[in-house]
Curated annotation (Swiss-Prot):
Residues 160-333 form the OBG-type G domain. This is GTPase Obg. One of its GO terms (cellular component) is cytoplasm. An essential GTPase which binds GTP, GDP and possibly (p)ppGpp with moderate affinity, with high nucleotide exchange rates and a fairly low GTP hydrolysis rate. Plays a role in control of the cell cycle, stress response, ribosome biogenesis and in those bacteria that undergo differentiation, in morphogenesis control. Gene3D superfamilies: GTP1/OBG domain (2.70.210.12), P-loop containing nucleotide triphosphate hydrolases (3.40.50.300). The gene is obg. It comes from Anaeromyxobacter dehalogenans (strain 2CP-C). SUPFAM superfamilies: Obg GTP-binding protein N-terminal domain (SSF82051), P-loop containing nucleoside triphosphate hydrolases (SSF52540).
Length: 354
């Protein structure tokens, strides 16, 4: 299934039906009074969270969405039928904005949550409502009011506890495939991952959702490399795993420079992103060059006024993954129990479900 995380749609609520001008036509009552019924109310446009959905693909090609109009009133005091509501189902994590102003209208995260995003018009009153002692035969009725309409932008922000960030080809997809049952595309070239992947990781007697965020590059906060689309999905994450490639980065790159560059992009996009707890890990330490680079980064960050722990991990051998998951779990659940496994041992694949 294609992953679509932003769409623009037009919604139109139903118009209210017009009230009727009608008269009583009964035997032996030659001049019956007014009997025009009211028009029905127009249907609302409603957004509803469907936990079975994970993308906005349904709205990519169908942009116009209109609820039913209310029916007109009729004679014999008969009111028109209300128009049916139009229910648009969206995945959890959908943010709705007014396309014209950019104002955020709602943030939909709970299964079954419903929001009326465009209110239907009110049905007009029939002429029977306007009869009075001075006007016993009103020849007019009220028109229904038009339903609300607006252009909307729907943005999907993934609901994940942990986001894995880093440069392209830093090993994010390999890591998530090792610690969960997610099976992203993995290849030895940058930007293999073009859409976020989700996996559920079992940790002790708990679990948490991890998102593999496609690789970030310098300028991501300004949209470079689809940066806006990718960074959006980090906003809801409570903890970030910051992967740094230890082996053979491109010319001119080094682990410390990569770490600083990605952190600068997070800060430029949002102050909130910059403040999120981070677990730093150097990847591919099964390669001697990467292990040496990781040890060097450990020393550099360890000398800071507030030392930053650096994990050395290999998704290939499993080395360091137990300790990494413990650090993530403690950051999420505020637990401080020490890791009991021996350092450097291979990881038995954690019990997890995608």
């Amino acid at each position: 299934m294609k992953f679509v995380d932003e769409v623009k749609i037009h919604v139109k609520a139903g118009d209210g039906g017009d009230g009727a001008v009608a008269w009583r036509r009964e035997k032996f009552i030659p001049r019956g009074g007014p009997a025009g019924g009211d028009g029905g109310n127009g249907g609302d446009v409603v957004l509803e969270v469907d936990p079975q959905l994970s993308t906005l693909l349904d709205y990519r090609y169908i942009r116009e969405h209109k609820a039913r109009n209310g029916e007109k009133g009729s004679g014999s005091d008969m009111n028109g039928k209300d128009g049916a509501d139009l229910v648009l189902r969206v995945p959890p994590g959908t943010v709705v904005k007014d396309a014209a102003t950019g104002e955020q209208l709602c943030d939909l995260g709970t299964a079954g949550e419903r929001v009326v995003i465009a209110k239907g018009g009110r049905g007009g009153l029939g002429n029977m409502n306007f009869a009075s002692s001075t006007n016993q035969a009103p020849r007019y009725a009220e028109d229904g009011t038009p339903g609300a309409e607006r252009d909307l932008v729907l943005e999907l922000k993934l609901l994940a506890d942990v986001g894995i960030v880093g440069y392209p080809n830093a090993g994010k997809s390999t890591l998530i495939s090792r610690i969960s049952r997610a099976r992203p595309k993995i290849a030895d070239y940058p930007f293999t991952t073009l859409t976020p992947n989700l996996g559920v990781v079992g940790w002790r007697e708990r679990s948490f959702v991890v998102a593999d965020i496609p690789g970030l590059i310098e300028g991501a906060h300004a949209g470079a490399g689809l940066g806006h689309q990718f960074l959006r999905h980090v906003e809801r994450c409570r903890v970030l795993i910051h992967l740094v490639e230890g082996a053979n980065p491109e010319p001119g790159r080094a682990p410390k420079a990569d770490l600083d560059a990605i952190n600068a992009e997070l800060a430029a996009y949002s102050d909130e992103l910059a403040k999120k707890p981070q677990i730093v890990a150097v990847t591919k330490i099964d390669v001697p060059e990467a292990r040496a680079a990781g040890v060097k980064l450990q020393k550099l960050l360890g000398r800071r006024k507030k030392p930053v722990p650096v994990h050395l991990v290999s998704a290939v051998t499993g080395e360091g993954l137990d300790a990494l998951l413990d650090a993530v779990g403690r950051a999420l659940f505020k637990e401080a129990r020490p890791h009991r496994g021996g350092g450097g041992k291979k990881l038995a694949k954690p019990r997890a479900r995608a």
